[in-house]
Amino acid sequence: MMKNILAIQSHVVYGHAGNSAAEFPMRRLGANVWPLNTVQFSNHTQYGKWTGCVMPPSHLTEIVQGIAAIDKLHTCDAVLSGYLGSAEQGEHILGIVRQVKAANPQAKYFCDPVMGHPEKGCIVAPGVAEFHVRHGLPASDIIAPNLVELEILCEHPVKNVEEAVLAARELIAQGPQIVLVKHLARAGYSRDRFEMLLVTADEAWHISRPLVDFGMRQPVGVGDVTSGLLLVKLLQGATLQEALEHVTAAVYEIMVTTKAMQEYELQVVAAQDRIANPEHYFSATKL
């Protein structure tokens, strides 16, 4: 059965971020994506200027009520949330999650707790980080912080891989069954590799791939693609190891393709066949 995912995150008209980054790769892996946009911007914010608007929180709820009215909400297998335009949007999203789970008790909630990177030009609204700590984390089945977000969620520094696994398990004690640490950065084993962790109460998997050097301007949307693809693989029945290995390879293929084409925006369409069938392989290690 094809899986249906309600993806609630940002949308850009030009380029790739949020749903505009994740939607096509997720579909390419065989999932139906129902994109519900928290913001509609001309382009992502790292250009330094953009136009567009943040959707009123009630807009999100109204759209989902429309899906419920045609009796299709029970076919939703998961809710994915990413970049929020406001903390109030987050509260509406949790209402949507409750509504979806009432219609389909098997449905999962995947929270990508985007909290902003001022140094990268990623700006989030006031109250969003607090929302994730207090409400998003305990409500989620799967949560996917990067290192900075992991430290905010567990409320202490994380200096190495062992501490990252322990921190992930602190989060698991508060609600989610699975934690993806999307980018270990300075807490990883190696400074010249891109490393991730996938952790449950009784398993921890580590994976690394080469960093792709884009100089000063790193492409945006890599985390959005990573979260979306991991959710698809897990819904399709992949093991933790299989899901982590496929996602790591698929994202690497997108990065390599983007660099080869000398582009700043992720080249998800050009890389589509290698998203489904990666040419590279990276082996995950059980810790």
From Swiss-Prot:
Pathway membership: Cofactor metabolism; pyridoxal 5'-phosphate salvage; pyridoxal 5'-phosphate from pyridoxal: step 1/1
InterPro entries attached to this UniProt entry: PM/HMP-P_kinase-1, PyrdxlKinase, Pyridoxal_kinase_PdxY, Ribokinase-like
Keywords tagged on the record: ATP-binding, Kinase, Magnesium, Nucleotide-binding, Transferase
Binding residues for substrate: 10, 45-46, 224
Cellular component aspect of the GO annotation: cytosol
EC number of this enzyme: 2.7.1.35
Record's catalysed reaction(s): pyridoxal + ATP = pyridoxal 5'-phosphate + ADP + H(+)
GO molecular function: ATP binding; magnesium ion binding; pyridoxal kinase activity
Chain positions recorded as ATP binding sites: 112, 144, 149, 182, 209-212
Cofactor(s), names only, from the UniProt record: Mg(2+)
Swiss-Prot/TrEMBL GO biological process terms: pyridoxal 5'-phosphate salvage
Record's subunit section: Homodimer.
Task performed by this protein: Pyridoxal kinase involved in the salvage pathway of pyridoxal 5'-phosphate (PLP). Catalyzes the phosphorylation of pyridoxal to PLP.
Record family assignment: Belongs to the pyridoxine kinase family. PdxY subfamily.
The protein, known as: Pyridoxal kinase PdxY
Annotated source species: Escherichia coli O6:H1 (strain CFT073 / ATCC 700928 / UPEC)
